[in-house]
Amino acid sequence: MASKKGVGSTKDGRDSIAKRLGAKRADGQFVTGGSILYRQRGTKVHPGLNVGRGGDDTLYAKIDGIVRFERLGRDRKRVSVYPVSQEA
């Protein structure tokens, strides 16, 4: 039986800051080239058409266009950017 009460308030009182991961642009939204679309750790979402992947797995738009979040098969997601047609 312990003779001291187990108190860990000074050792346990720390937490890491949030990394603000996740989608930064919505499906159907217009983006410019270089815009960050999705911040992530690993490839939770894969790069599709006109989307690049940074060194920290961040997905970004390579061209101006409309964002589309798509499914690749049953368990994989991808984000693409499609150019806006010039018919007006």
Swiss-Prot record:
GO CC terms: cytosolic large ribosomal subunit
Please provide the record's keywords in A-Z order. Answer: Ribonucleoprotein, Ribosomal protein
Q: Does the keyword Ribonucleoprotein apply?
A: yes
Cross-referenced InterPro entries: Ribosomal_bL27 (IPR001684), Ribosomal_bL27_CS (IPR018261)
Note the superkingdom of the native organism: Bacteria
One GO term (biological process): translation
Spell out the residue ranges making up region: Disordered: 1-20
* One Gene Ontology molecular-function label: structural constituent of ribosome
HAMAP family linked to this entry: Ribosomal_bL27
Q: Which family does it belong to?
A: Belongs to the bacterial ribosomal protein bL27 family.
Spell out the protein name for this chain: Large ribosomal subunit protein bL27
